[in-house]
């Protein structure tokens, strides 16, 4: 199962494999405190896209599309497919630090990863 979680929420066993998807390391956390298994800053939005978006909900739809195009352009599909495959076998949690829990890169990235799953593998 693929899920998302703010880094400021306590880690739990249910998180499974935790992947930090922020380009910048979250303030106030050591690597031990973050309890992440991977830091995939290469999957985060570019600095220019992140700054343009600025977590403005009015820009959300366009941000999602630009971010998807960025991932395609940077040939990240195989990396995202690997995450989707892992999420079929175990819990995978995309960890983020944004305050807005509805309009952030982890939400958009989860949507992209879920769209890559072959039909018939959706969770019930």
Please name every model-derived segment.
Residues 1-124:
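Residues lining hydrophobic/aromatic ligand-binding pockets adjacent to catalytic sites
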């Amino acid at each position: 199962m693929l899920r998302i979680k703010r880094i400021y929420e306590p880690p739990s066993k249910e998180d499974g494999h935790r992947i930090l998807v922020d380009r910048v390391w979250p303030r106030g956390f050591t690597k031990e405190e973050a309890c992440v298994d991977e830091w995939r800053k290469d999957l985060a939005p570019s600095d220019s896209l992140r700054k343009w978006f600025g977590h403005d909900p009015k820009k959300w739809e366009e941000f999602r599309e630009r971010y998807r195009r960025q991932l395609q352009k940077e040939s990240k599909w195989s990396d995202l497919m690997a995450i989707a495959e892992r999420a079929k076998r175990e819990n995978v949690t995309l960890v983020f630090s944004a305050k807005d829990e509805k309009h952030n890169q982890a939400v958009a990235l989860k949507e992209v990863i879920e769209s890559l799953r072959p039909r018939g593998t959706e969770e019930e």
